[in-house]
Every structure is written in C-alpha cells, then in structure tokens.
C-alpha cells in the first residue's frame, strides 16, 4: 500500500476545516492539481519499484475534477499496472460525479472517504457544508450501488448541537445501515482548530477555552445536548477501552478466518457456520455505543436529561457487553 497526494487545497468553505487557513498564505488558486502524467509516473514507480498494489490518495479533496481523477486511474491501468485505490471527497461531489463511478469501480476504486458530517440540516448549515441531508443519502447509495465502500466522516457533536440534531443524526444513521459503524461515528466531536470560522465563533460566544495553539475544548450552547455528551462519555469511560479492544480483535480474527475460508477449497462445513456466528457477535458488539446513545435520548425525552445517571443508563449495555464476551470466547473455543 502507498499513500500519495495528487493535489493541494479545496475550493469549498466549511467553517470547521483548517485547510482554508493552512493554504491562505499561499498565492494562487485554492485548489491546485498535479498533471495526470506526473501523478501516474509516481504511481508507476511506487508499483514497480516499491511493490505497491493499492494507492490511497491523501488529497484534501481528490474529486474536485472528476474527469482528471478518472484519467489518472485509467492512465495507470493503461501502463499495465494492476492496482486498487481510494480517495477522499464530499457528498455533493459524489452526487455531481455519479456518472463516473461505474468506470471508477472498473478502474480499481474500492472505497471513498465521504465527508458527510451530519444527518441534520441545521448542523450542516451551521458548519457551512453547502450540502444537504438528501445529498448525503444519495452519495452513500451511489457508492454502494457501484460496489464501492464508504468510509464515513461524521461530526455528531459541535458547539451548537441540539438534542433534535442528535435525534436526526440517529435517524439518518439507522436508516442508512450505519448503526454499528466502526469506529463509532456517534462519538465524534468537532475540533476547533486555529484560524477556523467555527473556532472564531466559539471564542466570540465565550464557550471556548484553552491554549491558542491547539484544538480548543469548549462548552456546548445547548444544556440538554451537553448533558447527553457527558452521559455518553461517562458510560463509555467505564467499558469503552475493553470494548474497543474486543471489537478490534474480532475484526482481525474475522479477517484471518475469512482468508482460511478462501483457502479451504470448498471444505468449509465446520468453519463457515462458526465464522457466520462470529460475524453476528461482531455486529452486535459494534452496535453497543449506538444502542447506549439511543437509550440516553429516549429516556432523556421521557424524564428529562438532568436527572439521568450514567451508572444506571449503562447497565443494560454493560450486561450485554459481558454476555457477548462470553459468547465470543465460546465460539473461539470451537474454532
């Protein structure tokens, strides 16, 4: 695997993004791309001399010019290099470039880092994403419809998040099959980087505090949303480390077992059902933080958020986590 950069900058103006500030002092356009030939020369060298067969474009936004992006992939393929690749972009650009994705998939595209950020239009507007929830939804379906995986970038909590935003995010997550996405996107919190509009707004509102040279911690404007974050963090602090370790271990083991299945040449009568069972356990474990947040939101709406106690809220989740650990151990004993 090799990482490379084919362009610099981004022509969009998200309030939370440090890219604008980073390149502000540089003369010229906000987005600058290397020539197709120059990029392909580097990729061919990495493939033939370095043995790379998968390329990850670390461009701030690889898909600013879809035609150029496709030309890069097709030009390398024309040189006889067998490879796969991945890149980062925005939801609205995926939608606008929909017609290119069948060719991208054929050229070797395997996954896209999709900057969705939110399932709440209010949050998208505050962040100045200049996209819609509908575009986020459409972008996911375009990727999945072309057998391209989506690596989802999400901002669950930002300084002005409301409980309604959180509920809309959860609705979006559930309705798009992201319930259990790992790492859990429901834990993501906006970072206030120096020079960003989001940071300036938080400082002006008097809710940001800390060193001027770092990502600032901040207080949430909405008291109920702040309480939800506290309850979620306290609950995850109790079992989160052990949970992460087990989920990652299961990911690694499933990858090994699936490789064994591929080598088994059809002799899978014993291994296949156990791997399926392990996948079910993985799915259940990965969903636990999502179930926890869903419980916090539901019970907070019913009884008020302030009286809720993390120790009581997390008991069902902790019970299921411990039960899942035992089930996983039993499956492993049978493998």
Task: Kindly give the residue locations of the regions a language model identified.
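Radical SAM [4Fe-4S] cluster-binding motif and immediate context
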Residues: 1-150, 158, 171
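Flexible glycine/acidic-rich beta-alpha junction loops that bind and position SAM and/or redox cofactors
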Residues: 12, 67, 122, 126, ...
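Alpha-helix termini
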Residues: 24, 175-184
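Short acidic/histidine-rich active-site segments
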Residues: 153
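Catalytic cores of alpha/beta
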Residues: 160-175
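Radical SAM enzyme core and accessory elements
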Residues: 199-202, 208-335
